[in-house]
Amino acid sequence: MKDNYFNLLNKLQLVNNNSNCFFQLIWTNSLMFFTQHNYFRDYYVKNKDIYIPNIIKRNNKCIIFSSGANWYWNDNKYRTDQHELTVKGMEIFIKEYPNIRLILMHPDETFIEGYPKCLEYLNFNRNALIDINSFNIIDKEKKFDSIYNSNFYAYKQHYLLEEIDNYKIALIYYHRNSNLNQAYYIKKKDIDEGYELEKRLLENKKFTLLNMANGKYKFLSKKEINEYYNESYSGLCLSDIEGACLVSVEYLLSGLPVISVKNVGGRDKFLKQMGIYAITDLNYNINEIEEAIQYYKN
């Protein structure tokens, strides 16, 4: 894998055909802001007017790029009302601040369906913006057969790992109700089920939660995460619905091949361009996941 590292970097640079359009906007406009779609949901639900920069309140001309959780706020089996709340927030925002040019960035063009027609859209994978200096190959002894860096949400499908056998799996996650990852819209039932699954995983010695110390979640720096990646043979992406999936590129830059289950939202399109560096479209089946882990371990 190390011998082909620069080939991988070239692939990552070429994977986003619309990056030139994005960077042209960056270079030719002096005032820009970056946010995620859930900002507008919160703006509508919780009226976060105090978080709007004064320069926007003064109605100065500027561009807001909104990206990130675009797939998540569309109606899906996990969040049936978030898309509607987000759209309402966007409509109110652009009405109150008419000098704002709001551009929505999507890694999968199919997800522009249902957003206000007055907005601009850019088919853009935000993984193109990752700091490539933070993740790289370093000489570390392998300690884990695979690693899964993922917040503890239902769509991340941690349950797929429960029956894993004879493999050491490193986990990095912040529980949905931890002080590092609070989400007011998560139902208590989902939180309780998440804690039960977390408990079962941690009782199994095959799993190591890297960002927990003395029973509390701790923040990991990019340097620490990169070191943990380099101590693993492969990186897991198990969500069934997800957009760009930032950790997939972190894995790749750290020299890890990616193991991905069937996915809707953009990650599958990205990883299929990675050739030998990714196994995609696995069924939600532990046997297939284990076979992929063994393949890259060899």
Predicted segments with their positions:
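Short alpha-helical segment that forms part of, or immediately flanks, the ligand-binding pocket
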Residues: 226, 248-253, 267-268
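Short hydrophobic beta-strand element within catalytic cores of glycosyltransferases
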Residues: 257-261
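Acidic donor-binding loop of glycosyltransferase active sites
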Residues: 148, 227-243
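Conserved catalytic-core segment of nucleotide-activated headgroup transferases in glycan assembly
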Residues: 45-46, 73-91, 98, 107-114, ...
